[in-house]
Amino acid sequence: MTLSADKKQPIIDKFKLHENDTGSPEVQVAILTERINLLTEHLKTHRKDFHSRRGLLKMVGQRRALLNYLRDRAPDRYRKLIQELGLRK
């Protein structure tokens, strides 16, 4: 499940750090979160789609690694990001 450009651009605009930013950890985590949410909805109706489930697990692992990187390098940006995305309680 991929995001179309028109859905991806508002996410990039919201989380970018500077004008041409598309690859900062914040942007990557936000895009992965949206993809994870879409795939989770897909898997609720297609329970036996194990290939997509594997892709979901890979995306969750990738997001976890990016969040760990951000937590170690910039804890204040990490806390702000998880609050905006609602990833923690």
From Swiss-Prot:
Repeat found in the keyword field: no
GO biological process: translation
UniProt-recorded Gene Ontology molecular function terms: rRNA binding; structural constituent of ribosome
Disulfide links within the chain: none
UniProt cross-references to SMART domains, sorted A to Z: Ribosomal_S15
GO cellular component: cytosolic small ribosomal subunit
Keywords associated with the record: Ribonucleoprotein, Ribosomal protein, RNA-binding, rRNA-binding
Pfam family, one: Ribosomal_S15
Alphabetical list of InterPro entries matching this protein: Ribosomal_uS15, Ribosomal_uS15_bac-type, uS15_NS1_RNA-bd_sf
Keyword RNA-binding: yes
PANTHER family xrefs: RIBOSOMAL PROTEIN S15, BACTERIAL AND ORGANELLAR, SMALL RIBOSOMAL SUBUNIT PROTEIN US15M
Subunit comment: Part of the 30S ribosomal subunit. Forms a bridge to the 50S subunit in the 70S ribosome, contacting the 23S rRNA.
Free-text function comment from the UniProt entry: One of the primary rRNA binding proteins, it binds directly to 16S rRNA where it helps nucleate assembly of the platform of the 30S subunit by binding and bridging several RNA helices of the 16S rRNA. Forms an intersubunit bridge (bridge B4) with the 23S rRNA of the 50S subunit in the ribosome.
Similarity section: Belongs to the universal ribosomal protein uS15 family.
Name this polypeptide is given: Small ribosomal subunit protein uS15
Organism of provenance: Desulforudis audaxviator (strain MP104C)
The encoding gene: rpsO
